[in-house]
Design a protein with these regions (language model features):
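Phosphate-binding and adjacent anionic-ligand microenvironments
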Residues: 1-67, 71-75, 81-89, 93-103
Length: 103
């Protein structure tokens, strides 16, 4: 199950998402699963992914600011079912909201 969302974001919020420091992430679970990785760089070449990707054993989400609009995008994938995907969506939005509240 896969889904993409778009939401409004100010320039300041977009910068916070793009420049997230993974050491500031306090969340340990996503959709009931332990978070296995919080990535801001590609594992293969250490290049910036321009946002953040959060991985669990049963799914993941990535959030990144739009380069052309005052918005950000969340990409989600559940390896379980639609209900799990909806929980991923809720938790991903909460994750991004926490990033925005920290600025």
């Amino acid at each position: 199950m896969y889904r993409r969302l778009d939401a409004a974001a100010s320039a300041e919020q977009k910068a916070a998402l793009k420049n997230l420091d993974v050491s500031s992430v306090k969340q340990t679970e996503l959709a009931g699963d332990d978070i296995l990785a919080v990535l801001t760089k590609a594992p293969g070449n250490d290049a910036s992914i321009g946002g953040v990707k959060v991985v669990t054993k049963n799914g993941w989400f990535a959030a990144r600011p739009s380069g052309t609009e005052n918005s950000y995008k969340i990409y989600l994938e559940s390896f379980v079912d639609q209900t799990h995907l909806m929980q991923l969506e809720s938790d991903a939005k909460a994750f991004v909201d926490a990033v925005f509240k920290a600025i």
